[in-house]
């Protein structure tokens, strides 16, 4: 059995592309990151990149793949495109969320280089410090609803994306009496913990009365020492 195979070249009538990609943002762990901020030894580099046509995600072309350089070439990471997620709205571009590991203490730089399919390239550099025992940061603590009548799911917004963290939530009455607590350890879902659910009962299994309660959330990054972060909020419980 025979088949015809057609091989096509480039379109000579196509408009040349001389516009490089745009790195719209680059930071470590959270968008609140500031230059030379101190981070944990296993931070995540996050960048938003766009192009007027298309970002090159191929790893076949030597020197034209997405690359991250640590300390201006002291070490390079060439599997960056595996951690690229396209924009949901169909724009030519997306988000890079690249997990790093084992960076030594002290000052460092990370330089990101991306290409489009022309190929044109763009670069951006982020400067930072690394230290052990860096406490995580809690940006928000909240429940899926407030007030609640049947159960409450607690969430914590933080700066430890894709890290193994221990989360504890404690509930108190307004006199400070502890009523309930729960602790879980697991992989964080980027910037938000998985929910811890309270069924509105105390440690003895009795449903709490309607009223206002205090809850305190604590997180600990298991890869970054014993430092913790804590935040508290109020929760209203109504009748069923």
What is each residue range found by the language model?
Residues 171-179, 213-215:
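Short, glycine-anchored, charge-dense loop/turn motifs used at functional sites
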């Amino acid at each position: 059995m025979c088949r015809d195979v057609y091989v096509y070249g480039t379109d000579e009538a196509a408009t040349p592309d001389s516009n490089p990609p745009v790195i719209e943002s680059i930071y470590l762990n959270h968008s609140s990151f500031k230059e030379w901020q101190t981070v944990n030894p296993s931070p995540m580099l996050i960048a938003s990149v766009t192009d007027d046509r298309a970002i090159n995600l191929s790893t076949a072309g030597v020197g034209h793949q997405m690359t991250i350089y640590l300390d201006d070439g002291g070490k390079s990471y060439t599997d960056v495109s595996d951690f690229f997620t396209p924009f949901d709205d169909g724009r030519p571009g997306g988000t890079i969320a690249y997990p790093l590991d084992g960076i030594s203490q002290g000052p460092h730089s990370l330089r990101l280089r991306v290409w489009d399919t022309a190929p044109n390239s763009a670069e951006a550099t982020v400067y930072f410090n690394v230290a052990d025992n860096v406490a995580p940061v809690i940006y928000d603590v909240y429940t899926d609803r407030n007030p609640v009548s049947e159960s409450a799911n607690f969430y914590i917004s933080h700066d430890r994306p894709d890290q193994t963290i221990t989360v504890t939530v404690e509930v108190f009455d307004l006199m400070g009496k502890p009523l309930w607590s729960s602790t879980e350890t697991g992989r964080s879902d980027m910037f938000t913990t998985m929910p811890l659910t309270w069924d509105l009962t105390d440690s003895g299994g009795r449903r709490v009365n309607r009223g206002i309660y205090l809850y305190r959330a604590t997180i600990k990054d298991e890869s970054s020492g014993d430092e913790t972060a804590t935040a508290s909020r109020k929760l209203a419980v109504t009748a069923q």
